[in-house]
């Protein structure tokens, strides 16, 4: 078998854990990592330390700047004879590597979000239209067993035509606050959490219901973070959690710290500054969650109208006692409900499992409830990560009854809703997506 030659753009924690390690350990028979590119040369050594299989393989390393990225990227593609690129860098730079990769005729795998705004998403669509390469957008949460089962039930017509979705998402104090420690807290970097985080959720809804978004309206606020956050020990900028003299006065951090140690909390989103090993040359992912530069929202409510007539009401809160969501999908013939709790603060909550399995409650419109149990999957995102990796590196499973691997149009739809949310919060208007939506 001829191996496909991959380059990784952005040696982030996500790149290492989600793509590089599996490529080296599970897919080396069909995928070959030939190059890594990053703005911080320290990330190459971090990758080697975390994935020993990378060492001694002759994998080329390319360090870029914001000014020379295109020149270095083009040289990497030519020198290493790259077939496909994995784009896992800071969100705001996705569009650069995606578009250039497509211009060079390469296949592109983009971590979500595909881009950070509608304009850049449309650039990606145009570039793909004119390229022999194709784009995959890695909305891995589709592959979660409970989410696949929901899609199956809707495709099978269990609730008839979908009329309304009610989705409330909770991001707990550990996970939620971490976004405000990192670069994600700036609109120009992440597009805002309505894109960086909620695009996951908007994609799920659109996929479940075959929905093309048309109109979006939202309200939002910065309630918990920034200088006016209720638990800010003092109004000052430039603090960092690791060496902050006010850590034990900070309600968000003192739970995980004592006067002589830090409690390590398992969290796949951020622990980089809670280790003795230096992970970055200059960037610090422990910036104060109360800094005044924060320019995104931590609470928002959203209404979306889809082309097929379905309606969505959605909310997200990034400072809750526990992690999880409540979901209800209503149709002309019935209703589906499910929920999930967990996270750093979720240990005291009622279990959403029965016999080790999560469940969906199905309510036929004129009959009694049926509880549908779904076996748990193995691996990240509820068992979704291993399955999407198989589709990426081995090709899509031909035996599935419905498409699941997200494409560029799915990225466009999810990002358009997320960007429209931020704009609607800012200007108070309903956002019309119909002129460009596919």
Q: Where do the model's predicted regions map?
A:
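C-terminal helical cap and adjacent loop that interface with cofactors, partners, or active-site loops
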Residues: 18, 296-438
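Catalytic cores of eukaryotic secretory-pathway lumenal/extracellular enzymes that build
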Residues: 13, 31, 91, 95, ...
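N-terminal glycine-/serine-/threonine-rich beta1-alpha1-beta2 phosphate-ribose binding loop
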Residues: 1-104, 122, 126-132, 393
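Predominantly a Rossmann-like dinucleotide-binding segment in NAD(P)-dependent oxidoreductases
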Residues: 12-17, 141-287, 428
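Rossmann-fold dehydrogenase core element
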Residues: 123-140, 161-164
